[in-house]
């Protein structure tokens, strides 16, 4: 039996009748430096960075004589190519399979010559470009939902039974997505509507979460597990919306004068997305305005031990992505 039909059968029997992100990307996905202040770059975990160019846009559009490039990493050591670092002979840097420890300040010293046409006098010019590169991941989504049902009274076992049956139906509706209902609660209130007597209504709230038992099996072949869980919980949200939409449809089209005393209140379904960040990551719209919706790796001096969205201060932390304060 369909879930929406099952719920109405229960109601009737109970109550009866009644990527990368940066401020200086160009259309080719390159990021140029800026003299005087660092350019912030955000690289999704396990992905490759954009191409970092050891020049500003103005210099890149001019002839450059005898250029040399020297890249240094977050530890101020000279960078050399390896499995995670690719440096070209034209000064382009790409960071591959990006992880938290790769976050930090990357600097490039560009040296080149200017030559006077009349005298052939050479002058050495040096420019330094800084890039602040941060690992980020998408937040883990869950959804807070609220609905209302009419009831005949705020006392009696029918309200508890409806609450338990509704939770079970909703859990079954989304179980194949490895999502489940958590933190369910309800309160009974009496409501006065214009030109009507008092009504008793159950105000029901719950959260739809993508981490039901067994959810880790989804991540066996994917480094970006939150992409999978977020997709699943979005589908779960859509199923919930459709379920309660059908409740309203049944009420308006399948009942004439007699309706169950306990029934869904039309237009009462409300949904709000909740974002959580994995340990070692957090949100900071002021510091990371170009990646305001991202969970960005916690910088040195901060940490995040849980799924909160804020990196907390800890002066003894000297690494990116700290999950504890020593």
From Swiss-Prot:
N-glycosylated. The keyword tRNA processing does not apply. This is Zona pellucida-binding protein 2. Residues 1-19 form the signal peptide. Belongs to the zona pellucida-binding protein Sp38 family. Disulfide bonds: none annotated. The gene is Zpbp2. Pfam families: EGF_Sp38_C (PF20626), Sp38 (PF07354). Glycans are attached at residues 86, 220, 256. One of its GO terms (cellular component) is membrane. It is found in: Cytoplasmic vesicle, Secretory vesicle, Acrosome; Secreted. Keywords: Cytoplasmic vesicle, Glycoprotein, Secreted, Signal. Expressed specifically in male germ cells. InterPro entries: Sp38-bd, ZPBP1/2_C, ZPBP1/2_N. It comes from Mus musculus (Mouse). Is implicated in sperm-oocyte interaction during fertilization. One of its GO terms (biological process) is acrosome assembly.
């Amino acid at each position: 039996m369909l879930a929406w039909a099952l719920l109405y059968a229960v109601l009737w029997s109970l109550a009866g009748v009644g990527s990368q992100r940066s401020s200086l990307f160009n259309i080719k996905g390159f990021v140029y430096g800026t003299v005087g202040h660092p350019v912030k770059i955000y690289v999704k975990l396990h992905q490759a960075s954009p191409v970092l160019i050891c020049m500003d846009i103005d210099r890149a559009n001019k002839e450059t004589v005898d250029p040399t490039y020297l890249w240094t990493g977050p530890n101020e050591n000279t960078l050399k190519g390896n499995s995670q670092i690719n440096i070209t002979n034209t000064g382009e840097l790409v960071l591959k399979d990006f992880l938290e420890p790769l976050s930090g300040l990357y600097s490039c010293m560009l040296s080149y010559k200017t030559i006077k046409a009349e005298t052939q006098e050479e002058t050495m010019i040096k420019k330094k470009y800084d890039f602040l590169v941060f690992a980020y991941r998408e937040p883990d989504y869950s959804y807070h939902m609220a609905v209302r049902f009419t009831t005949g009274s705020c006392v009696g076992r029918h309200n508890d039974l409806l609450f338990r049956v509704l939770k079970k139906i909703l859990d079954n509706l989304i179980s194949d997505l490895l999502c489940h209902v958590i933190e369910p609660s309800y309160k009974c209130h009496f409501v006065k509507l214009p030109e009507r007597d008092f009504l008793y209504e159950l105000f029901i709230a719950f959260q739809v979460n993508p981490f039901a038992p067994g959810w880790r099996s989804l991540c066996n072949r994917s480094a970006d597990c939150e992409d999978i869980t977020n997709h699943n919980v979005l589908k779960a949200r859509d199923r919930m919306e459709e379920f309660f939409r059908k409740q309203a449809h049944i009420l308006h089209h399948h009942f004439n004068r007699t309706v169950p005393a306990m029934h869904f209140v039309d237009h009462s379904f409300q949904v709000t997305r909740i974002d959580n960040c994995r340990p070692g990551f957090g949100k900071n719209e002021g510091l990371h305005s170009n990646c305001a919706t991202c969970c960005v790796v916690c910088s040195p001096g901060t940490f995040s031990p849980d799924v909160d969205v804020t990196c907390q201060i800890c002066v003894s932390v000297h690494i990116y992505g700290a999950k504890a304060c020593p």
